[in-house]
């Protein structure tokens, strides 16, 4: 009973929710054996044909390459690509690739030489003697990737599994309509496929190995059973035909009954899955020593005259393959890379075949029907019933259309396998898969931007922390430098402290002076004299330095004298040519004269009432008289040059002249009656008289040269003459006094 139950358990399969049964259309291409395609003239090899970053170029334009020669270096998750044939690298430039967006990617363009020469191949027939790491590294460097459609690097996938893998699943379901590449590969190369499975099992050491294949491939099932007849370590499980039973999560559940958690991987539950084509590529890489340079591609559709499966070199233009199969395009011909549900339409036929290309479908106009116009969602829930991932496609559609990224993420849009079952059953002809692809791309872009922002923030915070640490260290250094003086400063401080202590000690000592003795201050006096001598020497040195710095250059002195003379001449010319900007107002002059008379009367009263304690100094009186004469001459000139706006009163002028004569006589009498204590210097008096005569002559010349604009007032002339007579009389008296 237990054996029967174990056998039942061993062969048990599970069924997943949802799924559809579209027309298979596989008989068009699975009836003919694999065949080779003639080499194309030009090959375009994109550097990135897998999930992850592109490798580093190791060839340049003009290089000769052989088939299997690496074009890039694979480091980390970067997978290298290899030359599909021998030839010459003619260009390394962007080129449109096999992608729904048809964006250009960096590619190596090779012109084939037709010889198709291989690099030296080193196969490991005894791979069981190799370590796990060596096998994984060889698989990675030979460019093996998942050929089922994902394109994930096989070496990285094997390395990530580690020792946790208990079940190795080989996906041979190939559930999508039209595609028969794996079916034909298993029919023609079953032994090589099984050998590749054994290499994977040797690396992973799983507890069980399962091959899942749909029951619509009877020839492939027969070939595998024949190869596995003597093997007990590999189990072949035939499953019902249902789309998409070939999905990784769906096939895992069908064969093991285990579900991959949301956001997780199959390795989390101890399962690792590889494709049939990947197993065959592993065999060729390890045992034959051949990098992946070709793969099986299905050429099908009613627009192709000879449908079938071919060995297509990577980098071969799609146009070359279709033309070799008898392509008969219509007016609006469509070519799909992949199947009708998960594939995408090519914008043109010059894109190259890559590692994930498994089918080229060229349907006729009647084969797929006319494209239907998209209509509004009626919420019929047919898409939810057909979804194999147990999602709500109608809700995801609304979230994607409304740019509600958070809600779309909450409803597990990342679990969508883009199988197209929802779009197939939609009565409104809504291309749901396109909406979901766009939404996932936008979410990925947002997360990438958030990641960049987080990295930038981390870098900024690290920089700020570094600056704060440097600032704290700098302040600490400054603080330490301020607290701890330098060596020479320490010596100076110690010397100063020693002097202070010595003085304090001397101050505390009692001074004892014996009777009859004087204190000996010779040392102090000598020190004082030394300081004085030092100060004098320093002063003399400073004086010499200043004298040396201020020695006049003869040329410089001459230049300065010339400049002084020029300035003097310029000043004389300005004074001679200057025209009075403002005329003297007679009324203002009269007011000033009245003020002067009042001050003179006040001074006379003070002198009359005062008792002279001291005699008047004749020299001081002479100076005051000279100042008075100068002021009088200045006033006369201003009055002579002024244009009288109003007539002067004759009586007032006569009064002013009389007052002036009285003041002059009084001042002449004071020096005459004074007893001089000291004799006036005759030479000084002569000089003053000469200066007065020179000024008088100058005044006469100015008056003679002046152009009288108006007639001179006779009364004013009389006043001026009286003043001149008084001045002359005073000068004569002064001369007599000097002679006595």
From Swiss-Prot:
Cofactor entry: [4Fe-4S] cluster
Which GO molecular-function terms appear in the entry? Answer: 4 iron, 4 sulfur cluster binding; electron transfer activity; metal ion binding
Q: Which InterPro entries match?
A: 4Fe4S_Fe-S-bd, 4Fe4S_Fe_S_CS, Ion_transpt_RnfC/RsxC, Nuo51_FMN-bd, Nuo51_FMN-bd_sf, RnfC_N, Soluble_ligand-bd
Q: What is its EC number?
A: 7.-.-.-
Q: Kindly list the GO CC terms recorded for this protein.
A: oxidoreductase complex; plasma membrane protein complex
Domain (4Fe-4S ferredoxin-type): residue spans on this chain: 369-397, 407-436
State the free-text cofactor note: Binds 2 [4Fe-4S] clusters per subunit.
Which UniProt keywords are given for this protein, alphabetically ordered?
A: 4Fe-4S, Cell inner membrane, Cell membrane, Electron transport, Iron, Iron-sulfur, Membrane, Metal-binding, Repeat, Translocase, Transport
- Binding positions ([4Fe-4S] cluster 2): 387, 416, 419, 422
Where can this protein be found?
A: Cell inner membrane
Pfam families named in the record: Complex1_51K, Fer4_7, RnfC_N, SLBB
Composition bias, Low complexity? 573-583, 637-647
Please list the GO biological process terms of this entry.
Answer: electron transport chain
Extract the ranges annotated as region (Disordered). 571-590, 602-716
Judged by the first EC level, this protein's enzyme class is translocase
- Provide the membrane topology annotation: Peripheral membrane protein
Q: Which positions are annotated as binding [4Fe-4S] cluster 1?
A: 377, 380, 383, 426
Q: Which NCBIfam families match?
A: PRK05035.1, rnfC
Question: Which family is this protein grouped under?
Answer: Belongs to the 4Fe4S bacterial-type ferredoxin family. RnfC subfamily.
Q: Which PANTHER family match?
A: ION-TRANSLOCATING OXIDOREDUCTASE COMPLEX SUBUNIT C
Self-association or partners: how does it assemble? The complex is composed of six subunits: RsxA, RsxB, RsxC, RsxD, RsxE and RsxG.
Function, as annotated, reads: Part of a membrane-bound complex that couples electron transfer with translocation of ions across the membrane. Required to maintain the reduced state of SoxR. Probably transfers electron from NAD(P)H to SoxR.
Quote the protein name from its UniProt record. Answer: Ion-translocating oxidoreductase complex subunit C
